[in-house]
Amino acid sequence: MNISNTIQYIGVNDHEIDLFEGQYVVPNGMAYNSYAVMDNKIAIMDTVDVHFADVWLGNIKNVLGERLPDYLIVQHMEPDHSGSVFRFMEAFPEAKVVASAKAFVMMKNFFGTDFTDRQIVVGENDTLSLGDRTLTFITAPMVHWPEVIVTYDSKDKVLFSADGFGKFGALDIEEDWVCEARRYYIGIVGKYGLSVQALLKKAAALDIRIVCPLHGPVLTENLGYYIDLYNTWSSYAAEEDGVMIAYTSVYGNTKKAVEQLAEMLRKNGCP
């Protein structure tokens, strides 16, 4: 899949999974997204779940041909995205790994090594030149882990948004974005609204035309719509006006009372 003339999708779909993170039902599977940014030098954006490492490494080789990657950029250390880091570093011994300082601490714990001789530590507004383009790194702590960074490609105006703007579902299943993106946000990121708000403020200063998340489809059109939704969700505002009545009813009597209350509210103009 071409994201642009120089950015290729190299991720995988997982239809074997039934519960994402052991708790979220995903009837349409999951996508673990990864991207190849090709310039004078080549950067691979994040890895995939270790169970799909062979497929992913094959995708890299198919896209790159005779070329070899120069950098692996690790934006997020959750195992569905970092699980194949060690396999990548074995397969491409000349490549360097780019990540935040906290991410390298996690690598030491996860893999028994932090790739000391091959690491590039980045922080807020640090840059990496690939040739004709420059990647800028933006810290995004607690969106939704402490080590997270996102990456901006100033040439193609692409934001690699880590878990931001992600959704449940594999990419080979067509479905509406909002429902599963909302469920993903509430379950995965929802408690970190202030952190998301801080990241949205940083993103507002960028000219973004494409958003490449780690789950779900690449967003290329009407970005304001998606950003506005994220602003609403992360500020804990309501998408629509309305009243929710939460109840349980052992014998059915509370249900009857709730139905009467709902009817009274409707008659008084509540949506």
Residue ranges and their predicted role:
Residues D49-V50, P79, G166, V218, ...:
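Short, glycine/acidic-enriched loop or turn micro-motifs at the edges of active sites
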Residues V12, S100-K102, D163, A246-V250:
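Cofactor-binding loop segments of dinucleotide-utilizing enzymes, especially the Rossmann-like FAD-
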Residues N2-N5, A99-E221:
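Metallo-beta-lactamase
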Residues G224-P271:
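N-terminal beta1-alpha1-beta2 submodule of the flavodoxin-like/Rossmannoid cofactor-binding fold
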Residues N40, H51-V98:
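Active-site metal-binding motif and surrounding structural segment of the metallo-beta-lactamase
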Residues M45-T47, P69-M77, V97-S100, L159-A162, ...:
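Active-site neighborhood of phospho(di)ester-bond hydrolases with catalytic His/Asp-centered motifs
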Residues N2-L64, V150-D153, K157-S161, V243, ...:
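Conserved beta-strand hairpin/beta-sheet module of binuclear metal-dependent hydrolase folds
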